[in-house]
Amino acid sequence: FRRTDEENRQIMDRFDAERIHQILGDEWVILIRMHPKFPVENLPQNKYCYNMTDYNDITDLYLVSDLFITDYSSSVVEYALLDKPILLFAYDLAEYDRGFYFDYENMMPGQIAHTQTELYELLQNNCDNLPKRQNFVKFQYDNMKGDACGRILDILG
């Protein structure tokens, strides 16, 4: 994960949990889990926002969530299998220099917000994109036939 401690702080400067709470309402709770290698101090924490960075098993958090907001995390590959909405907050996409395995804009399994304003608009409206998510799951998982070791041994002769 390329983000430094300083860059993680910048992410949280752009992720306004209070504004998101206003948009979603009191029936929603925000669980924030930063990359564990780069924890961020002073994450918002109150009755509607919890820092889950130290929580060991992210898959538990997937199961209790109704929506996943992330940037470039590979976690979307697992989360997409749950068939729940995914929102991608890629405010620095133009500067992101690690590259992707596929076309991020067209292949990722959710709507992409490039700015805070876009993030808030997607949250206010229906940010779900079922066809995009279904295509992503098909792309990621349909070619898994099992027996990878056997196929490698066959290739090696």
What are these regions (language model features)?
Residues 1-42, 113, 149:
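Conserved catalytic-core segment of nucleotide-activated headgroup transferases in glycan assembly
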Residues 145-157:
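C-terminal alpha-helical cap of glycosyltransferases
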Residues 44-47, 74-141:
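Catalytic binding pocket for nucleotide-activated donors in carbohydrate/polymer assembly enzymes
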Residues 15-19, 53-57, 74, 98-99:
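A generic local structural motif
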Residues 26-29, 67, 134:
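PLP-dependent class I/II
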Residues 31-77, 82:
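Donor nucleotide-activated moiety binding/catalytic core segment of transferases
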